[in-house]
Every structure is written in structure tokens, then in C-alpha cells.
């Protein structure tokens, strides 16, 4: 085998001829292959210009990409980037670590970003993570002095309610005293739109909203405890805070239904509908918001926060139940107006009737018949049926519509005509009686009370009072002559009375007593003048009462 004369390159077995200049001579390290490249240190491994730590402990299996795998550069990882994984690690083979596919979590790289805590209420990030539980925190335990801790099985429902009310009241009082009124982050409701007062201060901050909610709940619980438990004594500051009466707001959907006049339906004619709802519920209703006051007019009180709010009804009362009753009445009016056509709304129809009655223009058309179809409930111009010309024909015999007198079924019945005439006479007699005048007497026209009354004159002998002889008798026992009768003088005097003779009255000397021309008692012929008077009138003289 040929060998070069000078050994300059060396082989895998023989190292290069390098001699140490200082120290003891020793063998150099074994020479590696030309393709060998030294592996960088574990703490300074680089990948695409970015440092990656603990690469050996990471699982290189494929997993779905998420937001944390998003790169900030345009480099893409490929097979060339894994060239360092092909070399043996610490003298072992180049195969990867054998681990189970069920190995989870701890060896994987934590995602970038802030770690989300399971319990949002735990603000201590450095401490151990709190386990979520359905039970409350031990620090929030409520201890009510004097209240039993163990609840027995023989407790009634009322006692359980009172116990729950006392525990909840103590919890609310503790929160209000310590100022811990804001619940944890996971139990908060979405924040509303910021609202400011006239001075630019925000009136609906988170703390103010939750404090007001707790105070309202405390007021309701105290009212409930006072009603259910006679031994309960409200707190001292309750009467002071009771000045803020319970109230509620009912917003009017004017934007959803701009064509409906909710304001008029709630107020009614001259405010009667609003007053009626206040009487039924016992609450006070005030309409506030945009559109409640005409432009250019100011309200008596200053309500800047209400003027900027939407149109609503502010309800205040002494009791929460009255507020709920009033809210139900207002919602009923709003729902009826929004779901019922205007022509079928009975509430609005009654308001129009009341307004016409107040103005004096009401015409009661409900009980009148339609002249076209004969039905109730509408007039002739509102009749849905076609025009019936026979409805305008009135029978003069029976008074019915739709036929003439010659076609009337009761044409030959005399009772119809007699009844019609009797009805006319009775109406005329009643009218004359109301006017204080005596009407013509007709058969059957006398009232039953007058006929059956004691001492009443029978109808057949009823005559005018000036035709009765006893009405002409004077205090002296004589009789006056009837009007326009050519009789003269007093001929008969009453017994025991001084007769008018020639000595007292010389002008009456020629008058005789008991003659036809004189007036005496009926027994002596004094009533003959009445007989002659009635004979001249074509009537028979009635018998004088004795």
C-alpha cells in the first residue's frame, strides 16, 4: 500500500503532529469526523434568532395551533430547523424520550399572556389558587347574636322565613358598615350608560348602584319582617331612611309606537283616568321625561335628571304592594293600546264618551236601532250591510217598520187603533196634570190611586167644582147665585141667623122668600134656580149633598 512520505493530514487513528510547547506531553482528544459539528450549550440554544429555553423538556408532538402559537415574524419552522435533534444527547441514542401520549400539562410550555384564574374573586395572584366551591367564603360567615345555629325539623314555614330575613338583614348591615358593597367580578351585571347630574358628577357609579340596591332590599326585608313577626323591632335609623318612599319607573314605549298617544290614554279627559288608577292602587303617579311638558313651559319643581330621561311614569307609595298594583294597571293600559286597533280599544272609547259627557255633547246611541238593518250598536251611516229601503217605511197602524198600513197584519184589529188612541189620551192627561190643569176625562185615564182613595168622587159623577151647589153656600146659610143667572137677592137665611130684610137693606124690599127667583134651602125650593141653570146648559143638575 502506498503511503505518502510526509504525514501532514493525519487519519482517524493517528492525530496530527501537534506538540505541546508547555507542560507534560499527553495525548490529544480523539479526532472527530469532518461532518461533526459541536452542539451549543443548553442555556444558549437559538432558534431563528430567538432564544428557546427547556427545549428538551418540551413535547414536540403535533398539536392544534392556537392564538399563542402566532409568530411575530415571517419565519416558518421546517425540517431544517430540527437539525440539532438528530445528534445523540449525553452519549445516548438519538431517539426521542419515550413518554406516554396521556402525559398532560406540566411538561408543556405554558401559553403566553396572563394566566386566567379560575376564581375571579381571588385577587391574590402570588398565593395558591382557590378552588371554586358552591359554599361561601369562611370570612363572609354571618353570626347573628341570639339566633339559633341549628334549625330543627319541627319548624314552620313562617319561622323559617323570619330566620332567613334576620340572617339576610345582618349580612346587608355588615356590608353597608364595612363598605364591601361591590360583588366579585364574576357576579357583576353589565355597567349601564354613565349618567351625570347638573354639576357634572356621575350619579350611577358602581358603588352607588350596589349600595342603593342593598338599601332597597333592606327596606323591603324590614317591611316584610314587621308584617310577619309582631316581636320584630325595626332599627333606629329605619324611620329616618323610611322617608325615601318605595318607588318604581315604568317607561312608555313612544319610540316603538310613535303613532299611539300613550300620554292621553294614561291621563284621560281632565286627568280622570290617572286619578282613577291612583284611587284603585293607592299610589301617586307622575309622568316625567321628554315630552311630559310642552316646549316653552317649565315644571314647578326642578327635575334635571328626569327631563333628560325617556318618557316614563314615576310611581311612589307608602307600601311596595301598592307600587306593584299601580305598575300592573299602567302596563295593562300600555299593552292594550299597543296590541289593539284604535277602533276596538274600549278604554279609549270610554274616555271619548266621558269627554263628550263633560262637554255636554253626549248622544246616547247605544240603545238606538239602526234605521237600515234594525240592529243595535251602530247608526245608519255606520251600517256594514247594504242599504235596505224597506226600513224607511213606517206603518201608521202598528208603528212598525218595513211595511205599509195596507199590508199590516193588524189592519182589521180594532184593539190596535183603540190602544193607540188610549195611549195618546193618557199621555195628554199626564201632561195636563203636570201643568196643573184639568184635562179631558177619558175612560180609563183616571189614576188608580185617585179611584180607590177614600172619599174620592166616582169618575162618572166628576164635575167642575163651580158646578156643585154646596160650594155656593155662604157663612150665613144662604146661597149665591150661579154666574150669569138672572136671580136676585137672598131669600132664605140660615137657621139662627138674622135674615136680610127690608129694614136692614131698603133696596131689597121687593124680594120674596121662597119664590122661584129666590134662593132658599133645597127643601123649600131654593134649589130650583140650579135646576133651571143646568137645564139652560143642557145638563141635569146633580143631587146636592145633605
Curated annotation (Swiss-Prot):
PANTHER family: RNA-BINDING PROTEIN RELATED, SPLICING FACTOR 1. SMART domains: KH, ZnF_C2HC. Residues 251-330 form the KH domain. Keywords: Metal-binding, mRNA processing, mRNA splicing, Nucleus, Repeat, RNA-binding, Spliceosome, Zinc, Zinc-finger. A zinc finger (CCHC-type) spans 368-385, 393-410. The gene is BBP. Necessary for the splicing of pre-mRNA. Has a role in the recognition of the branch site (5'-UACUAAC-3'), the pyrimidine tract and the 3'-splice site at the 3'-end of introns. Signal peptide: none annotated. InterPro entries: BBP-like, KH_1_KHDC4/BBP-like, KH_dom, KH_dom_type_1_sf, SF1-HH, SF1-HH_sf, Znf_CCHC, Znf_CCHC_sf. It is found in: Nucleus. It comes from Cryptococcus neoformans var. neoformans serotype D (strain JEC21 / ATCC MYA-565) (Filobasidiella neoformans). Pfam families: KH-I_KHDC4-BBP, SF1-HH, zf-CCHC, zf-CCHC_3. This is Branchpoint-bridging protein. Its main location: nucleus. Residues 50-128 have a biased composition (Basic and acidic residues). GO terms for cellular component: commitment complex; cytosol; nucleus; U2-type prespliceosome. Residues 1-141, 178-199 are annotated as: Disordered. GO terms for molecular function: mRNA binding; zinc ion binding. GO terms for biological process: mRNA cis splicing, via spliceosome; regulation of mRNA splicing, via spliceosome. Belongs to the BBP/SF1 family.
Amino acid at each position: 500500500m502506498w503511503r505518502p512520505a510526509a504525514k501532514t493530514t493525519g487519519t482517524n487513528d493517528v492525530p496530527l503532529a501537534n506538540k505541546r510547547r508547555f507542560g507534560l506531553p499527553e495525548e490529544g482528544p480523539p479526532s472527530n469526523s469532518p461532518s461533526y459539528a459541536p452542539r451549543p450549550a443548553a442555556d444558549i440554544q437559538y432558534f431563528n434568532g430567538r432564544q428557546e429555553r427547556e427545549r428538551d423538556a418540551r413535547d414536540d408532538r403535533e398539536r392544534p395551533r392556537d392564538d399563542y402559537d402566532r409568530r411575530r415574524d415571517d419565519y416558518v419552522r421546517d425540517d431544517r430547523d430540527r437539525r440539532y435533534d438528530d445528534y445523540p444527547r449525553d452519549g445516548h441514542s438519538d431517539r426521542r424520550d419515550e413518554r406516554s401520549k396521556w402525559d398532560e400539562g406540566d411538561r408543556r410550555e405554558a401559553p403566553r399572556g396572563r394566566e386566567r384564574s379560575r376564581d375571579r374573586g381571588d385577587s391574590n395572584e402570588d398565593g395558591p389558587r382557590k378552588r371554586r366551591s358552591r359554599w361561601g367564603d369562611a370570612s363572609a360567615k354571618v353570626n347573628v347574636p341570639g339566633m339559633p345555629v341549628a334549625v330543627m325539623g319541627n319548624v314552620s314555614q313562617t319561622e323559617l322565613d323570619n330566620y332567613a330575613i334576620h340572617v339576610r338583614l345582618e349580612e346587608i348591615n355588615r356590608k353597608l358598615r364595612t363598605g364591601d358593597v361591590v360583588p366579585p367580578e364574576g357576579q357583576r351585571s353589565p355597567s349601564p350608560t354613565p349618567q351625570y347630574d347638573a354639576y357634572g358628577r356621575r350619579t350611577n357609579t358602581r358603588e352607588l348602584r350596589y349600595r342603593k340596591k342593598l338599601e332597597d332590599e333592606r327596606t323591603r326585608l324590614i317591611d316584610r319582617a314587621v308584617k310577619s313577626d309582631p316581636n320584630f323591632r325595626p332599627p333606629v335609623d329605619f324611620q329616618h331612611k323610611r322617608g325615601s318612599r318605595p318607588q318604581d319607573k315604568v317607561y312608555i314605549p313612544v319610540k316603538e309606537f310613535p303613532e299611539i298617544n300613550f300620554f292621553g290614554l294614561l291621563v284621560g279627559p281632565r286627568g280622570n283616568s290617572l286619578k282613577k288608577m291612583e284611587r284603585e292602587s293607592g299610589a301617586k303617579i307622575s309622568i316625567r321625561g321628554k315630552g311630559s311638558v310642552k316646549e316653552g313651559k317649565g315644571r314647578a319643581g326642578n327635575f334635571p335628571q328626569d327631563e333628560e330621561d325617556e318618557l316614563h311614569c314615576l310611581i311612589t307609595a307608602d307600601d311596595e304592594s301598592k307600587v306593584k298594583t299601580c305598575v300592573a294597571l299602567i302596563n295593562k293600559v300600555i299593552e292594550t293600546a299597543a296590541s289593539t286597533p284604535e277602533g276596538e280599544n274600549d278604554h279609549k272609547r270610554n274616555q271619548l264618551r266621558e269627554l263628550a259627557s263633560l262637554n255636554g255633547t253626549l248622544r246616547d246611541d247605544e240603545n238606538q236601532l239602526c234605521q237600515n238593518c234594525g240592529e243595535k250598536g251602530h247608526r245608519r251611516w255606520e251600517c256594514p250591510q247594504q242599504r235596505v229601503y224597506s226600513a224607511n217605511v213606517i206603518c201608521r197602524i202598528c208603528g212598525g217598520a218595513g211595511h205599509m198600513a195596507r199590508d199590516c197584519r193588524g189592519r182589521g184589529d180594532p184593539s190596535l187603533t183603540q190602544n193607540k188612541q188610549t195611549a195618546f189620551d193618557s199621555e195628554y192627561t199626564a201632561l195636563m196634570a203636570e201643568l196643573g190643569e184639568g184635562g179631558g176625562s177619558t175612560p180609563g185615564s183616571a189614576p188608580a190611586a185617585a179611584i180607590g182613595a177614600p172619599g174620592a168622587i166616582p169618575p162618572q159623577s166628576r164635575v167642575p167644582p163651580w158646578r156643585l151647589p154646596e160650594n155656593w153656600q155662604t157663612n150665613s146659610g144662604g146661597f149665591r147665585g150661579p154666574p150669569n143667572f138672572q136671580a136676585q137677592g137672598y131669600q132664605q137665611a140660615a137657621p139662627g141667623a138674622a135674615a136680610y130684610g127690608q129694614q136692614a137693606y131698603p133696596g131689597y124690599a121687593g124680594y120674596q122668600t121662597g119664590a122661584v127667583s129666590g134662593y132658599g134651602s133645597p127643601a123649600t125650593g131654593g134649589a130650583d134656580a140650579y135646576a133651571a141653570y143646568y137645564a139652560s146648559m143642557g145638563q141635569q143638575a146633580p143631587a146636592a149633598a145633605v
